[in-house]
Curated annotation (Swiss-Prot):
PANTHER family: SUPEROXIDE DISMUTASE CU-ZN -RELATED. Zn(2+) binds at H71, D137. This is Superoxide dismutase-like protein YojM. The gene is yojM. GO terms for cellular component: plasma membrane.
Length: 196
């Protein structure tokens, strides 16, 4: 009898738990990587390292959800590393340090990092998780960016924007770029980057 009563109580608890809704995502969560058809991308950016060697590319398109979808395919990176990845305010990749790209893309004047209670820069992107072969190939979403002329969030304005890979992981908190170290790879997005 006790076993039957215990079994009925456990069953009732299990059924009651099924109707619970998933809690909403926290406001400053790291955007998830996505699956998107790569043929739909309209802007192509070549990536170069500090020696000037081509090490991959980035493709960009307006997202069906919000912001931009960014496809990055890169090689010759540190195997197994987690590397900071950001959008910078100028489409310039002067070697060897890529400082010509200026500061982080931040048209909304926020603080840096997905874990920062003051919000995050529009140019903050998730860390790149490099494979054991030194390669990364991923599509991610940048919700606070656009290619629309006249938009404050447009990364394709008069001076373009740059995509930068850093030498270390972004801690998602520290200004201005999450303690992610030197800029080691750069790709400049300018008006002539449209895919043919």
């Amino acid at each position: 009898m006790h076993r039957l009563l215990l079994l009925m109580m456990l069953t009732a608890l299990g059924v009651a738990g099924c109707g619970q809704k998933k809690p909403p995502d926290p406001p400053n969560r790291v955007p998830e990587k996505k699956v998107v058809e790569t043929s739909a991308f309209g802007h192509h950016v070549q990536l170069v390292n500090r020696e000037g060697k081509a090490v991959g590319f980035i493709e960009i398109k307006e997202s069906d959800d919000e912001g931009l979808d960014i496809h990055i395919s890169a090689n010759s990176l540190r195997p197994g590393a987690s590397l900071g990845f950001h959008i910078y305010e100028k489409g310039s990749c002067v070697r060897p340090d890529f400082e010509s790209a200026g500061g982080p893309f931040n048209p909304l004047n926020k603080e840096h990092g997905f874990n920062n209670p003051m919000g995050h820069h529009a140019g903050d992107l998730p860390n790149l998780e490099v494979g054991a072969d030194g390669k990364v190939d991923v599509i991610m979403n940048a919700p606070d960016t656009s290619l629309k002329k006249g938009s404050k969030l447009n990364i394709l304005d008069e001076d373009g924007s740059a995509f930068i890979i850093h030498e270390q992981a972004d801690d998602y908190l520290t200004n201005p770029s999450g303690n992610s170290g030197a800029r080691i790879v750069c790709g400049a997005l300018l008006g002539n980057n449209e895919k043919q």
